[in-house]
């Protein structure tokens, strides 16, 4: 058999490259985000005068450009700092990768040239190692550090707000927090909130025309000439605009549509491929969400699918009865079930509707599955 990679690599493709369709790629220009770049820059610019900039909190739904804009501003500040020979560092931490205070501080120490292991030291030793980096006799001039905590809500839920407390209590450190959730500060204790000197920047969703502009720029360098039409770009943009203006989703639609064209050995992307791509992405997204749910939430979802198949009306009380049978001895309280229901609804897997049973009978929550039941079953099998 010939080398499979050579065979695939030599196959005709409508792609010139896929890298520009990856949401992690940071282009030279970010359409419709100039004002947000300036908003970040107006705070960070203080570091060029050797002043620690204020903390920043950036909000916005998935795919609104929060991370891309922040990393774009990071690159530009680093360029100016290098030209002026200033000791300014901007370090990016994704809190899904480093989700405890210890891990984040160890990572920052490593990025700043101090080898600290990810385990084995006490918390006090790691904190001291981090703070020692800011002494003049270690790095010469005062170091100004801007720490970008992307998906900061993850560490707050997982490990509390200790990392924010430590960073805000360290001289010459500024925090830029990024979150999809505008209410994430509910996880921060008052004494830590008071030490945050944060300025807030909100990223609105992209509209359909803005998404068209983004996709046009990316498609020019991603596809062979004539492979993509304005109609395809408009369709991808319209579908993504309905998904709360998610540019990541728009890029994923475009890339998946191109992959389908390659599979069908078509030299152009047809609009029907976009619709097929939408189904693929949604199926993949649902499976990814379900398999990463905590085991107890999976049990609740499994109980909902069971009752759905039996065509029963799903009240929280009936749901808890079935859940108890499934979970057996490893179960949570009835009150905790309400939290799981709310979280599953936020993820779009279910919906709830409060109805009145009539005078004197109170109100009842009715739960409805919002996804293809076979797909949920498939995802629940994957977890095993």
Swiss-Prot record:
Keyword terms of this UniProt record: ATP-binding, DNA replication, Nucleotide-binding
Biological process according to GO: DNA replication
Keyword Nucleotide-binding recorded: yes
Transmembrane feature ranges: none
Binding site for ATP: 64-68, 206, 218
UniProt-listed SUPFAM superfamilies: P-loop containing nucleoside triphosphate hydrolases, Winged helix' DNA-binding domain
Superkingdom, natural source: Archaea
A Pfam family annotated for this UniProt entry: Cdc6_C
Annotated function: Involved in regulation of DNA replication.
Family: Belongs to the CDC6/cdc18 family.
This protein's name: ORC1-type DNA replication protein
Lineage: Archaea, Methanobacteriati, Methanobacteriota, Methanomada group, Methanobacteria
């Amino acid at each position: 058999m010939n080398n499979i990679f050579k065979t695939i690599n030599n196959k005709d493709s409508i792609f010139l490259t896929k890298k520009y369709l990856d949401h992690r790629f940071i282009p030279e220009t970010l359409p419709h985000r100039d004002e947000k770049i300036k908003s970040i820059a107006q705070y960070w610019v203080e570091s060029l005068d050797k002043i620690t900039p204020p903390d920043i909190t950036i909000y916005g739904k998935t795919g609104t450009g929060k991370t891309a804009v922040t990393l774009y501003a990071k690159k530009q500040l680093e360029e100016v700092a290098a030209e002026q020979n200033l000791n300014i560092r901007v370090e990016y931490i994704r809190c899904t990768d480093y989700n405890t205070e210890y891990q984040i501080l160890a990572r920052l120490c490593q990025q700043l040239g101090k080898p600290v292991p990810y385990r084995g030291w006490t918390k006090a030793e790691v904190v001291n190692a981090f703070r020692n980096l800011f002494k003049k006799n270690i790095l010469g001039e005062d170091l100004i550090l801007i720490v970008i905590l992307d998906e900061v809500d993850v560490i707050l839920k997982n490990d509390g707000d200790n990392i924010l407390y430590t960073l805000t209590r360290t001289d010459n450190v500024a925090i830029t927090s990024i979150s999809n959730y505008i209410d994430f500060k509910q996880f921060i204790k008052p004494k830590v909130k008071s030490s945050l000197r944060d300025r807030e920047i909100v990223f609105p969703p992209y509209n359909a025309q803005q998404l068209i502009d983004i996709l046009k720029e990316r498609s020019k360098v991603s596809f062979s000439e004539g492979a993509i039409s304005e109609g395809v770009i408009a369709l991808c943009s319209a579908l993504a605009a309905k998904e709360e203006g998610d540019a990541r989703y728009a890029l994923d639609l475009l890339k998946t549509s191109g992959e389908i064209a390659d599979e069908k050995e078509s030299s152009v992307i047809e609009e029907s491929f976009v619709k097929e791509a939408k189904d693929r992405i949604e199926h993949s997204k649902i499976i990814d969400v379900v398999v990463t749910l905590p085991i107890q939430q999976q049990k609740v979802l499994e109980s909902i699918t069971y009752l759905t198949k039996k065509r029963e009306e799903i009240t929280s009380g009936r749901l808890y009865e079935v859940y108890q049978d499934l979970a057996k001895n490893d179960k949570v309280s009835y009150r905790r079930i309400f939290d799981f229901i709310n979280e599953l609804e936020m993820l779009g897997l279910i919906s709830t509707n409060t109805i009145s049973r009539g005078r004197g009978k109170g109100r009842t929550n009715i739960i409805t599955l919002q996804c293809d039941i076979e797909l949920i079953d498939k995802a629940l099998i994957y977890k095993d």
